[in-house]
Protein backbone atom coordinates (compact mmCIF):
# COMPACT_ATOMS: atom_id res chain seq x y z
CA UNK A 1 0.00 0.00 0.00
CA UNK A 2 1.30 3.48 -0.88
CA UNK A 3 1.57 6.04 1.92
CA UNK A 4 0.40 9.59 1.12
CA UNK A 5 0.43 12.74 3.18
CA UNK A 6 -2.72 14.88 3.41
CA UNK A 7 -3.20 18.26 5.05
CA UNK A 8 -6.47 18.53 6.99
CA UNK A 9 -8.01 21.27 9.05
CA UNK A 10 -8.30 20.71 12.78
CA UNK A 11 -12.12 20.49 12.70
CA UNK A 12 -12.11 17.91 9.90
CA UNK A 13 -9.50 15.85 11.73
CA UNK A 14 -11.63 15.92 14.89
CA UNK A 15 -14.62 14.71 12.87
CA UNK A 16 -12.56 11.90 11.33
CA UNK A 17 -11.39 10.86 14.80
CA UNK A 18 -15.00 10.90 16.04
CA UNK A 19 -16.08 8.71 13.10
CA UNK A 20 -13.19 6.34 13.77
CA UNK A 21 -14.24 5.95 17.40
CA UNK A 22 -17.98 5.80 16.74
CA UNK A 23 -17.81 3.30 13.88
CA UNK A 24 -14.94 1.22 15.24
CA UNK A 25 -12.34 1.84 12.54
CA UNK A 26 -8.80 0.87 13.49
CA UNK A 27 -7.33 4.19 12.37
CA UNK A 28 -7.75 7.42 10.44
CA UNK A 29 -6.49 5.82 7.24
CA UNK A 30 -9.40 3.37 7.27
CA UNK A 31 -11.90 6.22 7.60
CA UNK A 32 -10.31 8.10 4.73
CA UNK A 33 -10.12 4.97 2.51
CA UNK A 34 -13.83 4.24 3.07
CA UNK A 35 -14.75 7.88 2.37
CA UNK A 36 -12.69 7.85 -0.84
CA UNK A 37 -14.34 4.63 -2.00
CA UNK A 38 -17.80 6.08 -1.31
CA UNK A 39 -16.98 9.20 -3.35
CA UNK A 40 -15.65 7.08 -6.22
CA UNK A 41 -18.77 4.86 -6.16
CA UNK A 42 -21.04 7.91 -6.12
CA UNK A 43 -19.19 9.40 -9.09
CA UNK A 44 -19.36 6.09 -10.98
CA UNK A 45 -23.12 5.82 -10.36
CA UNK A 46 -23.60 9.38 -11.58
CA UNK A 47 -21.84 8.56 -14.85
CA UNK A 48 -24.04 5.50 -15.39
CA UNK A 49 -27.22 7.60 -15.54
CA UNK A 50 -28.80 8.17 -18.94
CA UNK A 51 -31.93 9.68 -20.45
CA UNK A 52 -34.34 12.10 -18.81
CA UNK A 53 -34.13 12.10 -15.02
CA UNK A 54 -35.44 13.95 -12.01
CA UNK A 55 -33.02 14.97 -9.30
CA UNK A 56 -32.55 17.05 -6.18
CA UNK A 57 -29.23 18.82 -5.67
CA UNK A 58 -28.29 20.00 -2.18
CA UNK A 59 -25.46 22.48 -1.64
CA UNK A 60 -24.03 24.04 1.49
CA UNK A 61 -21.67 26.92 0.87
CA UNK A 62 -20.31 30.04 2.55
CA UNK A 63 -22.48 33.13 2.01
CA UNK A 64 -19.54 34.89 0.41
CA UNK A 65 -19.82 32.65 -2.69
CA UNK A 66 -23.50 33.33 -3.42
CA UNK A 67 -22.55 35.21 -6.60
CA UNK A 68 -20.70 32.15 -7.90
CA UNK A 69 -23.68 29.90 -7.15
CA UNK A 70 -25.97 32.32 -8.99
CA UNK A 71 -23.61 32.45 -11.98
CA UNK A 72 -23.48 28.66 -12.30
CA UNK A 73 -27.22 28.33 -11.70
CA UNK A 74 -28.05 30.73 -14.55
CA UNK A 75 -26.24 28.45 -17.01
CA UNK A 76 -28.65 25.62 -16.11
CA UNK A 77 -32.03 27.34 -15.88
CA UNK A 78 -33.30 24.98 -18.59
CA UNK A 79 -33.19 22.05 -16.13
CA UNK A 80 -33.71 23.77 -12.75
CA UNK A 81 -37.42 23.84 -11.93
CA UNK A 82 -37.21 25.18 -8.40
CA UNK A 83 -34.53 26.60 -6.14
CA UNK A 84 -34.80 27.11 -2.40
CA UNK A 85 -32.24 29.20 -0.54
CA UNK A 86 -31.85 29.39 3.23
CA UNK A 87 -29.34 31.08 5.50
CA UNK A 88 -27.79 28.71 8.02
CA UNK A 89 -25.74 29.37 11.12
CA UNK A 90 -22.03 30.11 10.90
CA UNK A 91 -22.35 32.18 7.71
CA UNK A 92 -23.39 29.30 5.47
CA UNK A 93 -26.23 28.92 2.99
CA UNK A 94 -28.27 25.90 1.93
CA UNK A 95 -29.38 25.62 -1.68
CA UNK A 96 -31.86 23.02 -2.85
CA UNK A 97 -32.44 22.62 -6.58
CA UNK A 98 -35.25 20.50 -8.00
CA UNK A 99 -34.08 19.40 -11.42
CA UNK A 100 -35.57 17.69 -14.46
CA UNK A 101 -33.59 17.08 -17.60
CA UNK A 102 -31.14 15.04 -19.60
CA UNK A 103 -28.84 13.07 -17.29
CA UNK A 104 -25.72 14.44 -18.97
CA UNK A 105 -26.86 18.02 -18.29
CA UNK A 106 -27.75 17.20 -14.64
CA UNK A 107 -24.35 15.56 -14.16
CA UNK A 108 -22.66 18.60 -15.73
CA UNK A 109 -24.40 20.94 -13.25
CA UNK A 110 -23.33 18.87 -10.24
CA UNK A 111 -19.78 18.64 -11.54
CA UNK A 112 -19.59 22.42 -12.06
CA UNK A 113 -20.38 22.96 -8.38
CA UNK A 114 -17.87 20.26 -7.39
CA UNK A 115 -15.14 21.69 -9.62
CA UNK A 116 -15.43 25.24 -8.29
CA UNK A 117 -14.01 24.04 -4.97
CA UNK A 118 -16.10 26.47 -2.91
CA UNK A 119 -18.91 24.18 -1.74
CA UNK A 120 -18.80 22.70 1.76
CA UNK A 121 -21.24 19.91 0.90
CA UNK A 122 -22.79 18.65 -2.32
CA UNK A 123 -25.32 15.85 -2.63
CA UNK A 124 -27.17 14.84 -5.79
CA UNK A 125 -30.12 12.48 -5.40
CA UNK A 126 -31.52 11.10 -8.64
CA UNK A 127 -34.75 9.28 -9.38
Swiss-Prot record:
Binds 1 nickel ion per subunit. Gene3D superfamilies: ACT-like. Chain A, domain 2, Met repressor-like. The keyword Nucleotide-binding does not apply. GO terms for biological process: response to nickel cation. Its cofactor is Ni(2+). GO terms for molecular function: DNA binding; DNA-binding transcription factor activity; nickel cation binding. Coiled coil: none annotated. Keywords: DNA-binding, Metal-binding, Nickel, Transcription, Transcription regulation. It comes from the Archaea. Disulfide bonds: none annotated. InterPro entries: Acetolactate_synth/TF_NikR_C, ACT-like_dom_sf, Arc_rbn_hlx_hlx, CopG, CopG/NikR_regulator, Ni_resp_reg_NikR, Ribbon_hlx_hlx, TF_NikR_Ni-bd_C. Ni(2+) binds at residues 74, 85, 87, 93. PANTHER family: NICKEL-RESPONSIVE REGULATOR, NICKEL-RESPONSIVE REGULATOR-RELATED. Transcriptional regulator. HAMAP family: NikR. Belongs to the transcriptional regulatory CopG/NikR family. This is Putative nickel-responsive regulator 1. It comes from Methanothermobacter thermautotrophicus (strain ATCC 29096 / DSM 1053 / JCM 10044 / NBRC 100330 / Delta H).
